[in-house]
Amino acid sequence: MASIQDLYETVSRVLGNQAGKVISALGEITVECLPEHYISVMTALRDHEELHFELLVDLCGVDYSTYKNEAWQGKRFAVVSQLLSVKNNQRIRVRVWVSDDDFPVVESVVDIYNSADWYEREAFDMYGIMFNNHPDLRRILTDYGFVGHPFRKDFPISGYVEMRYDEEQKRVIYQPVTIEPREITPRIVREENYGGQ
């Protein structure tokens, strides 16, 4: 198994300027790329004989609209993929920043990694990130009539509608949420108050 530094150098050399940034931090390698290079970066990571990242272990969306309790200045959405090379016993992360915050779209990697199918559907369902050329991009965790994307940071915690069984209609119905929205402020305990002093 090669070291993290060796992997960093190999990835930087193989991807060249297709990788916007190659970051080595906390014992991990992260490749950040632009949407127009996403497919070529993922293909190179899978097919290059020195890398051979043949497994997509995970793919998820991320909403950076507020990050570290402050307003985020960059792009709002990213798609993050975790790749594994069984042959080399190495892992790598690929982050692609989605260009449009209002209508986030990125290319699908289903043709490169079959396992991306349901992961991309989940990112679409939860974050509203569209994946071009996905064979079956539809909701996977929420109802077909669900409004909004619940993992977006601007989605209300209680949601917009609730469902319940209506005895008169003998079916499940949707109705506006009856929970009063409120701000929850945590109680702060200072050290000087420890121990009942």
Swiss-Prot record:
Superkingdom of the organism of origin:
Bacteria
The record lists the catalysed reaction(s) as:
a quinone + NADH + 5 H(+)(in) = a quinol + NAD(+) + 4 H(+)(out)
For whether the record's keyword set contains Nucleotide-binding, the answer is: no
Give the quaternary structure.
Answer: NDH-1 is composed of 14 different subunits. Subunits NuoB, C, D, E, F, and G constitute the peripheral sector of the complex.
Q: Looking at its record, which EC class is this enzyme?
A: translocase
Which Gene3D superfamilies does the protein's record reference? NADH:ubiquinone oxidoreductase, 30kDa subunit (3.30.460.80)
Which HAMAP family does this chain map to? Answer: NDH1_NuoC
Q: Which UniProt keywords apply?
A: Cell inner membrane, Cell membrane, Membrane, NAD, Quinone, Translocase, Transport, Ubiquinone
**What is the protein name for this chain?**
NADH-quinone oxidoreductase subunit C
Q: Which Pfam families match?
A: Complex1_30kDa (PF00329)
Q: Which gene encodes it?
A: nuoC
Q: Which organism is it from?
A: Neisseria meningitidis serogroup B (strain ATCC BAA-335 / MC58)
Chain's role: NDH-1 shuttles electrons from NADH, via FMN and iron-sulfur (Fe-S) centers, to quinones in the respiratory chain. The immediate electron acceptor for the enzyme in this species is believed to be ubiquinone. Couples the redox reaction to proton translocation (for every two electrons transferred, four hydrogen ions are translocated across the cytoplasmic membrane), and thus conserves the redox energy in a proton gradient.
